[in-house]
Amino acid sequence: MVLEVKNLSFKYSQKLILDKLSFSVPKNSITSILAPNGSGKTTLLKCLLGLLKPLEETEIKACNKDILPLKPYEKAKLIAYIPQVEYYAFNFSVLDFVLMGKATHLNLFAMPKAKHIKEATSVLERLDLESLKDQGINDLSGGQRQMVLLARSLLQRTPLLLLDEPTSALDLKNQALFFDAIKDEMKKRELSVLVNIHDPNLVARHSTHVVMLKDKKLFLQASTPIAMTSHNLSALYDTPLEAIWHDNKLVVYAL
């Protein structure tokens, strides 16, 4: 397993948000987190990254390493992260922003070399972003920034990628391009993905595994075909839902 989580609990102002979650992310998989609104999906990702401190009984291992005591630059060698759309304090050019993905591969104060710039440009081309390379990151649309964040994460070349609602600002074309780029990368090297996503249809189309959360706890973990059933989805969302598979594609609708 690339990621192993045991007994993850988190409190905010004495209010329990996550209660003893235990789950894992297999190698070369896309594992989706599916849960009702307000279930702590983003909080979970921030706990995994060390941006929030879980309770003491929590154990988190990435690539068999206990990541809770690791320093930020050590975690950055294991985990890349794409947050929900945000602005940045400095309006870096897109190319310079993407090159930051190479920071963990360089010595302190070292500048990117020509090979790194070539690699960054190649990633931008793959994602149809080359024309934006000289623009400021804050001058882009939300969807464009998400694609640039993906480019930076791919350049980081970590074994684990965490995504928080990565397609919420993307149109249908770029949703497909986003996940196709990840799947292409998975064919080239070992890469596992944990993604917080709200659309069951996207989960079914792109995920190999699903983690469902409900009432602060783990509700279900299974492979996508086993998890994404009418019974499980209706129980998860407390509303009657019909899930129909056809040609390996899922359609979910309310009854």
Curated annotation (Swiss-Prot):
Principal cellular location given in the protein's record: membrane
Family annotation (InterPro entries): AAA+_ATPase, ABC_transporter-like_ATP-bd, ABC_transporter-like_CS, Metal_Ion_Import_ABC, P-loop_NTPase
One protein family per Pfam: ABC_tran
Molecular-function GO term, any one: ATPase-coupled transmembrane transporter activity
Any one biological process term the GO annotation gives: iron ion transport
Gene3D superfamilies, alphabetized: P-loop containing nucleotide triphosphate hydrolases
Ranges where the ABC transporter domain occurs: 3-240
Membrane topology: Peripheral membrane protein
GO CC term (a single one): ATP-binding cassette (ABC) transporter complex
UniProt: ATP binding residues: A35, P36, N37, G38, S39, G40, K41, T42
Signal peptide interval: none
Keywords from the named record: ATP-binding, Cell inner membrane, Cell membrane, Ion transport, Iron, Iron transport, Membrane, Nucleotide-binding, Transport
Superkingdom classification of source: Bacteria
Annotated compartments: Cell inner membrane
Family according to the record: Belongs to the ABC transporter superfamily.
Function, as annotated: Part of a binding-protein-dependent transport system for an iron chelatin. Probably responsible for energy coupling to the transport system (Potential).
Protein name: Probable iron chelatin transport ATP-binding protein HP_0888
